[in-house]
Amino acid sequence: MEREGLIELKINVRDYSKYFLSQNPFPAVGVPEEFPRITVDRELIKLRFQNVISEVINTNKTIITVMVGEYGSGKSHLLKLFRNSVNAQLLTRETGALAVYVKSPGEDFSDLFFAIVDGIGKELLVDQINRFLNEELNTSDYSKLIFDTSIRDDYVQKKATIRQILSKSQYIEIFKRISKKYFGQIKSTDAIFSFLNLAHPDNSTKAWRWFLGQRLGKEDLEALNADQEIDVNNAYQLFLDIVNILRIMGIKHLVILIDELEKITLLPSTKRAKYQDQLRQMIDDNPSGMCFYFAIAPRQWDALTKETTALVRRLAANWYVLDDFKTSETRELIEAYLFSVRTPDYKADKIRNVLPKCEPSLYPFTNDAIDAISKKSKGVVSNILTLGRISLEILQEKPKQYPVVTPELINKEIEKI
């Protein structure tokens, strides 16, 4: 019974077990997963990326690539897949390749800088710094700068942790020595000290906030031994410094995957021209060990390439189009999602005997339904997934009217996507 002014909420669980599915496998929201599980077709695209990475690592040259695709075609999905593949397989001391996904270039270079730092992640940076400091503190003598006698004794016996050493020492003096020894070519001392402070137990959060452009008080800046915060005026130089610091840490190759490049076409002309010139400068100032991989929508790519700028000349040298899915690829995508949630009692023979119109791997979708989805979706991946999800929901809601997913269900029940 409903109370006045309220609706009675019942938590209903949709049961898809009669279709040999543990749940509806298609995503409810068209947002790419952080760690994509299912990637269908795109073999040529993946091969292209493999070749780009191989060339960057084997020749140490910088490579620029632009992927052009409609909204919903899977650009973000692929960029995240590229990032995860590099970091899972090539982020080693031998290869030293790190990939960073950037959701959007933002409105100026400071936005891009903050996104790159955030994309790298605090955890990875702290791991790199701890490994670096552990080697340095155990091969050089810093005992005189440790004021806690018990920690100093542990340090001499190589028992003290990085956190213990830094929290009970003149850590700024330690960082100054390390800076002079390793970071002489880095222009910004703020970047050096904030970077090293990421390993300090009391200053790590402050240092991370500094790198993300968040406001810090005078005391926090003093704790980091930093003079100024990051803004649009110093972001580009800090980017160059961070790239060099990462190389000192052992990151020899950096892969920057920038999504939604079309955002720069929406900027006012003066601001757009300045930002484009900084992006061009970013490419020119990093002739080795880098991969800049951009994604952009076709209409905005056409608009961008009509501009005869230095950035466009660099981008237009290597680009390709991400094609929409054909019927065969639509089928393969739906099949893969269904397979990911098949129940243990799924048996192909059961389906063949009861529903000969359905291929077992596609059940409860008929072959004609796949054709209808391909046509209605126009081959756009996000549309295919949306149609798949809605089809199963309707099937579950109207089982007597639709025992399986048919073209009639798709065309009559789903008006627009």
Regions found by a protein language model. Name each.
Residues 2-26, 40, 44-46, 201-365:
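The catalytic "switch" region of P-loop NTPases
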Residues 5-39, 68, 88-89, 93-126, ...:
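Extended charged low-complexity segments that act as oligomerization/scaffolding linkers
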Residues 54-58, 81-94, 281-285, 309-314:
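Short, surface-exposed basic-aromatic patches at helix termini and helix-loop junctions that form
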Residues 1-63, 145-154, 160, 164, ...:
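A short, basic N-terminal segment
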Residues 77, 142-146, 264-267, 400-402:
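Eukaryote-specific, cytoplasm-facing alpha-helical/coiled-coil scaffolding segments in long proteins
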Residues 2-5, 165, 177-180, 187-198, ...:
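C-terminal alpha-helical "lid" subdomain
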Residues 64, 69-249, 381:
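P-loop NTPase nucleotide-binding core
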Residues 51, 55, 118, 194, ...:
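Short, hydrophobic/amphipathic alpha-helical patches that form generic packing surfaces
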